[in-house]
Amino acid sequence: MDRKILMLVALVAAASATAQETYENARIATEDLNGTARYVGMGGALDALGADLSTIGTNPAGIGLFRHSQAKISFGFVSQQDARDFDNANKTNMSFDQVGFVYSMRNGRKSFVNFAFNYHKSTNFNQILSAANVLSGASQNKLSYLKGAGGLFSVGPNDKGDLVGDNNMFNSVDYLYYNAFLTTHDEDGVPSYGYNDATAYAFNRASSGYIGEYDFNISGNIDDRLYLGLTVGIHDVNYNGYSEYSENLVSSEGTPVGSVAIGDERIISGTGFNIKFGMIFRPIENSPFRIGISASTPTWYDLSTRSHTVLANNTDLGEYDSGTSDEAYDFKLYTPWKFGLSLGTTFGNYLAVGASYDYANYGKLDTRINDGGGYDWYY
């Protein structure tokens, strides 16, 4: 068989949301427990207790409980000593978690108006992830095959002679599989398609980067009973990940035929913003018991991604030993609304008790590819 090297360059991808991995979307949309030492030590259950800079991003009214101006800075470490060695990733990383200040102004005998700024690392992407297991009746190349056989797209040659799909459900991994592995041509050039099941897989991912959140807050209280706050947050996304996925393949008779591996390097960057509202009130005048309510708009992200994907065909099947794909596109990611309810009280000067409940329907996570053109395909 004539073995070749296959190359794909995707300049602007009018692709479906499947081009952006669900894992990475979920990591961008969710947050780590991070902030001041007090906030982390309380498990984040300070939304009703307030008077902590980290509540600026969860219940903005918490800043309204400050009576004096102050500044804080926090550091931390992320350690995965039990992780396997992969891609020269560090197992221990220092983390600059938080820095901020609050400026408090008295506005009457019992009322204050406060202004605050806080930076915190809402998500730390420094992580090594590994997984391996057996497979039965499944494989990644089979998934690409079934997408075409099931009618999600039709495959045919473009003017360069390489196989492409006819709609946005056809992504770069499908392209690599159809051109390098799934397709064979007879002597007359007529293509036929087939897949191979896998008996085992191995997956490794190393990622780095962060989402930095810059929060600007105005808050205050009325008669030391009702506390109100508003925060505008700006998010800065920096993600770099590299993953490798390999499968051991067998023929239809169960005979080993070799392996196929996919390596993917992806960079995501961009910004987002949201607005948060909060209220805390003391229903009993002489009691420290407090109830907190908060709401956050979606975080509206404008992001760009660039990826380089490599397929290594370590079998005698298909028509190419390897293939590469480079793509770049812009997309929007909108997180769902988030609502919070919290309770808190203190016992003297020695004990604080807090409880927080947050609700967000991540089934409403919205990803939209900026459709500015189409794929350009090259050998």
List the predicted regions and their residue ranges.
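Outer-membrane beta-barrel porins/channels
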Residues: 20-33, 104-379
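Outer-membrane beta-barrel translocator/receptor signature
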Residues: 37, 49-58, 63-136, 209-212
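Single-residue recognition of alpha-helix boundary sites
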Residues: 14-15, 70, 235, 360
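Active-site-proximal flexible loops/turns
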Residues: 9, 66, 240
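A broadly conserved detector of short glycine/acidic/proline-rich loop/turn motifs that flank catalytic sites
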Residues: 11, 46, 77, 105, ...
